[in-house]
Amino acid sequence: MYKRQRLTFLGADHEVTGSCHYLQACGKNILVDCGMEQGNDVYENQELPIPAADVDYLLLTHAHIDHSGLIPLLYAKGFRGRIFTTNATKQLCDIMLRDSAHIQMFEAEWRNRKAERSATLKKFVPLYDMEDAQNVMRQFEGYDYGCIIEICDGINIRFTDAGHLLGSASIEVWVEENGVSKKFVFSGDIGNVNKPLIKDPAYIKDADIVVMESTYGDRSHGGTPDYVGELKQIFKRTFARGGNVVIPSFAVGRTQELLYFIRKIKEDNEKDNYLPEFDVYLSLIHI
């Protein structure tokens, strides 16, 4: 009996975090991303809406926690399927998922000390622990961009550089079932062009169904900003007042770009002495 392919949005449908899509095809249950919602309390409302043990495969677009952060929870709930991603994303997840577990365990210790002194606060239980984060990495398989991978009879996938983060990808999924072929494309997070450390995104030309992120879909970026020039002006104004510049930044991706721009400013400064000499300190959590 012919069964329709089904696509269900489990996360990031009315928000920009917690990305998770559920594709049912060829008798298989496939998740595309399994991200953690991020907001005032990132550990609330994170229950998985499907039985984890029923998931056969997980396709991962990139390592940011809002796309990968619930993978250890999926494992803790019984998922033992294969995880397909790029080589770089696999390596980053090995660091970032363990870091996520460490943060949760540290926060649990802090919250539970407070709960012991309160009649109203409940005991806090992490979504997953370090063992879950380490064990699920055994299910990761890393692949190069451009390779066509058969994940099962009737389903092939390919990763294409999305230009967002080291290892980030858009994923093409070809499904052939009951003599009918369809191509799904999951964009993942798409990067901008002319970035200093990451290649421009490679665009996919055809698809039957496209699932696309649209975080910045309502605005035009215009030309490439002069990040070095703008930072240089901020440094000059702040140093002239005897101040220090503090820059909050995402640990993976943005911090490395900032360090690149600051290095460029220091190199230029050796020639024109536009600024006084200054030191750069990086928070340990960003290393």
Question: How would you name each of these model-derived features?
Answer:
Residues 4-59, 68, 75-255, 263-273:
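His/Asp/Glu-rich metal-coordinating catalytic cores
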Residues 260:
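Phosphate-binding glycine-rich/basic clefts of nucleotide- and phosphate-handling proteins
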Residues 1-5, 285-287:
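Conserved small/polar residues in nucleotide/adenosyl-binding loops
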Residues 82-88, 278-285:
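Short internal beta-strands
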Residues 62:
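Active-site recognition of the HExxH zinc-binding catalytic motif
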